[in-house]
């Protein structure tokens, strides 16, 4: 059984989660500390001697409350922030030794605000440009394929900044895939969307699994986490306090209650009926409790 882990606030720094063994390591945090001074001059620590590995093929969700370190971790990986101490490796090479061009070929980030991904005056131009700067072969053909896959073909000549929320989000994801990185980071991909658009983007993210290698998502959307993630990393007070599957995370009440995770409503409803139930979707809920409720058709 994969080891579960919960760390109280005072846990010694050398004790850390032991994630399940996976494929080759493509990114590693080695004793990484990040700290800064507030506007009042007070010291603030985000991470203290953080150790963590991301493996090839991982589909990871980073979860935790605001200020837990999710965005900081992503910014460290793409070189937007530098650690106060420790090192970050990509494919066994320190990012300190990588030129920006070499770093961007290995890892790319799709920002929470999709508009930040648009440079050209058309979606087709943005996708093509992303591949041109990465020197991806057959970029014209690949652009058409991505426009088709992300249901953007009819919007090819539209300015991304003028699209609807869902269209804009799909376009930003297509650009992220076009960058062809070994590791793709997605910051809050379902934030600020209505219910229908959110479901559409969740389907898009699921489809992307077939054409992306390693993906890390930072999110507060627990339904997305439960339906999409194959590995969940829980951040709390600047520490990785849990690392495992959805059953290991949401089925561990210590983690859920002490870290303040809010499971999907359908999961909570299932637990209220049966504490051993682990239902993450409506279909799973109905299947789990089929026949346990009276038929009220004649009542």
Walk through the language-model features, giving the residues of each.
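Helix-to-loop junction immediately C-terminal to a conserved catalytic motif
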Residues: 78
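Conserved ABC ATPase "signature" region
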Residues: 137-155
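Conserved ABC ATPase signature
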Residues: 159-163
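ABC ATPase nucleotide-binding domains
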Residues: 1-28, 256-299
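Catalytic Walker B motif of ABC-type/P-loop ATPase nucleotide-binding domains
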Residues: 184-187
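Conserved ABC transporter NBD signature motif
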Residues: 86-94, 103
């Amino acid at each position: 059984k994969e080891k579960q882990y919960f760390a109280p606030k005072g846990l010694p720094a050398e004790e850390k989660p032991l994630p399940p063994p996976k494929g080759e390591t493509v990114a590693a945090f080695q004793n990484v500390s990040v700290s800064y001074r507030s506007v009042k001059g007070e010291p603030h620590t985000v991470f203290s001697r953080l150790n963590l590995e991301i493996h090839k093929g991982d589909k990871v969700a980073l979860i935790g409350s605001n200020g837990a370190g999710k965005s900081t971790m992503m910014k460290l990986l793409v070189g937007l922030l530098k650690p106060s101490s420790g090192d970050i490796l990509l494919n066994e090479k320190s990012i300190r030794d990588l030129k920006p061009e070499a770093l961007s070929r290995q890892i790319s980030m799709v920002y929470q605000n999709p508009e930040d991904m648009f440079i050209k005056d058309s979606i087709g131009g943005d996708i093509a440009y992303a591949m041109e700067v990465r020197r991806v072969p057959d970029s014209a053909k690949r652009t058409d394929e991505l426009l088709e896959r992300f249901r953007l073909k009819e919007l090819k000549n539209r300015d991304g900044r003028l699209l609807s929320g869902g269209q804009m989000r799909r376009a930003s994801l297509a650009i992220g895939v076009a960058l062809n990185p070994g590791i793709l980071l997605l910051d809050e991909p379902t934030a600020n969307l209505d219910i229908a658009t959110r479901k559409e983007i969740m389907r898009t993210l699921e489809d992307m699994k077939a054409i992306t290698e390693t993906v890390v998502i930072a999110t507060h959307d627990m339904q997305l986490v439960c339906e999409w993630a194959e590995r969940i990393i829980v951040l709390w007070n600047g520490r990785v306090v849990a690392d495992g599957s959805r059953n290991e995370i949401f089925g561990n009440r210590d983690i859920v209650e002490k870290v303040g995770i809010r499971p999907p409503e359908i999961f909570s409803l299932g637990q209220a009926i049966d504490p051993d139930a682990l239902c993450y979707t409506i279909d799973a809920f109905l299947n789990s409790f089929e026949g346990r409720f009276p038929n009220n058709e004649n009542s």
